Amino acid sequence: MPQIIQLQNATIGYPDKVVLDHLDWEIQRGEHWAITGPNGCGKTTLMRTLLRLIPLRSGELRCYDVEGKLTEGLVTSYLPQISQIDRHFPIHVYEVIDSGLPDALKPAKERWEQVQHLAEATGISHLLGQPIGRLSGGQLQRTLLARALASDPELLILDEPLSFLDRSYKESFEELLSTIVRPETTILMVTHDLQAGDQEHWQVLSLGHF
């Protein structure tokens, strides 16, 4: 698979604080990376930089399209930590998924069919009419994953997707990723929960241990 992202001699952080320095990292299309490390080591700051929410302090961040040419924008989806979601917000599962669809001008019938397809793929068809406040942690995570996949992303960034989930949901979520995410989709997962047996499926970038 060709390269999708390259960080070269990158300094990452904020105007008053350097979080990561002299970072070199190359990511190929279709690779699955687990970003690990202690709290405060820069995992979230790195993801925010890749999402271009904060600028590089110095160095180079290059993104490449499917033909290997430099591009300013990748089709990227972000799955936040479920602890960041306001469960009291009055929105239903089908509305959450629909909000991830890229073309707001599509006919309502076509959008609904896409929502149903994504809900079926993530095993939440029976929950489409439920408000998010009634969902379990695992059900909410699947809802957010369906939304993230709605744009058919080239790059999928998962921020602590296994936190606050019990063991059975963790296993089912990992299995879900392997079955419904396209092989050519690149996945970056911030996690504290990577088990030794999972490391054969994930390349690991360990921060705070340079």
PLM regions and their residue ranges:
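Conserved ABC ATPase "signature" region
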Residues: 110-127
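Conserved ABC ATPase signature
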Residues: 131-135
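Hydrophobic anchor residue at the start of the ABC signature
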Residues: 145
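Conserved catalytic motifs of ABC-family nucleotide-binding domains
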Residues: 152
